[in-house]
Amino acid sequence: MVRPRRAPHRSGAGGPLGGRGRPPRPLVVRAVRSRSWPGGPRGPQPPRIRARSAPPMEGARVFGALGPIGPSSPGLTLGGLAVNEHRLSNKLLAWSGVLEWQEKRRPFSDSTAKLKRTLPCQAYVNQGENLETDQWPQKLIMQLIPQQLLTTLGPLFRNSQLAQFHFTNRDCDSLKGLCRIMGNGFAGCMLFPHISPCEVRVLMLLYSSKKKIFMGLIPYDQSGFVNAIRQVITTRKQAVGPGGVHSGPVQIVNNKFLAWSGVMEWQEPRPEPNSRSKRWLPSHVYVNQGEILRTDQWPRRLFMQLIPQQLLTTLVPLFRNSRLVQFHFTKDMETLKSLCRIMDNGFAGCVHFSYKASCEVRVLMLLYSSEKKIFIGLIPHDQSNFVNGIRRVIANQQQVLQRSLEQEQQQRGMGG
C-alpha cells in the first residue's frame, strides 16, 4: 500500500503549494513494499498491472520498485515533488524495446527543426515483483515536458508503481543529449497508443543527474492521469507559439493555471437605434492549480451575447450548481473598458458553443465584479437544462424588445 507522508501543516495564507511569497514546498513521498495494488475505496484498481514483492527487510524503507534506501538518500525532484531513488542492482528485466523522442536542434541551426532520437531501452523491477509488459509496444514515444508544468499532479504521482529504466550506450550522443535535457528541468511523458491492448496508457520518466539513473512512474489511476497530462500538454501548446517558439512563460495568475486561450467576440449596442458594433478581445481562462478543465476541444473563438441580469433570476438554481473559472482579457484597453462598463450596468454574457464543437460544454455565463475587477465564468454542470433555460430567456428578451419597438413606432405615428 502506498503511504504518502504528509508534510507538517503550517498556518498562514496561501494556496495548496505553500504560503504566499514562498516557493512550493517539496512533497516528500515514501512507500512500503506491497503484495498487491491498493484495494477497496482508496482509488482505482487496474486489474492487470500488479506489483508483488517479499516483505521489506527490517529497518529498510522501500519506495515502489526501486528497492531499499537510506534515510539520507538524495532525492529526485519533480517541481515540488521530491522522490527517493536507488541505484540499479538486484533488479529483474521486465521489458526491452526502443524509446523515441524529439529534441530541438542547437541554437545555431534552424530553431523550428526537431531532431528525432532513439535509444535501446530496458525497464527493471525488484526481484519478486511483477510488471505485466507482454502487451507493451516495442517502441515507446516520449514527449518532453517542463517539470514546472507537472507540479499540480503531485497527488497522482504519489500513487504510482515505479520501475527503473536503463539505456544501452550504443549512441552516446543521444544518451548525453537526453541526460542534458532532463537534467535541466524536463520530464518525459510516454503515451501508449490506443491500439495497444495493455492497460497502461501513460508512463512518466524522470532523471536524477546526481545518481545518473532514470526512473519510470506508472500511475495507478491511469484514467485520471491521462486527463491531467492532456491538460498539461494543451497548456504547453498554448504557451508555445508557432514553430515551438515561446510566447512567454506559462501564465499563473493568483495561483491559477492557464486552461484555454483564444478570442472572445460580442456585439455591443451603439447610440444609434438598432445599431450594434462588433467587438473582440484576446481571452484566457484560468482554473485553480490542481483542477482539470478539458478545453482541448474548445473552439479558438467564443461568441458572447449580452443579456440583462434581471432576466436570469429564474436560472439561479442552475447557477448554484456550476463550476467557476476566471477569465482574463488582454491588449485593447478601450474595448475592455467598454465591456466592463456594460457588464457593470447590469448585463451578463452568455457564451454559446458551436454545435460543431465536440466538447461537452454547450454554454457558459460570464459575470463581472466591479469591486474585485475580475471576470468570472460559470460552467453549469446541468448543461442540457441550462441551455433550455437560457433559450427561453433569450426568446423572452426578443419578445420584450419587439413589443418595445412596436410601442415606440405607434407613439411616433400618433405624434405625426
Swiss-Prot record:
Per UniProt, which keywords does this protein have? Activator, Cell membrane, Cytoplasm, Membrane, Nucleus, Phosphoprotein, Transcription, Transcription regulation, Ubl conjugation
Residues recorded as bearing Phosphoserine in the entry: S53
Where is region (Interaction with FLOT1) located? 184-416
Against Gene3D superfamilies, the record matches this protein to: Mediator complex subunit 25, ACID domain
> Where's it found, cell-wise?
Cytoplasm; Nucleus; Cell membrane; Cytoplasm, Perinuclear region
According to its UniProt entry, what is the function of this protein? May activate transcription. Required for nuclear translocation of FLOT1. Promotes cell proliferation.
Name recorded for this polypeptide: Prostate tumor-overexpressed gene 1 protein homolog
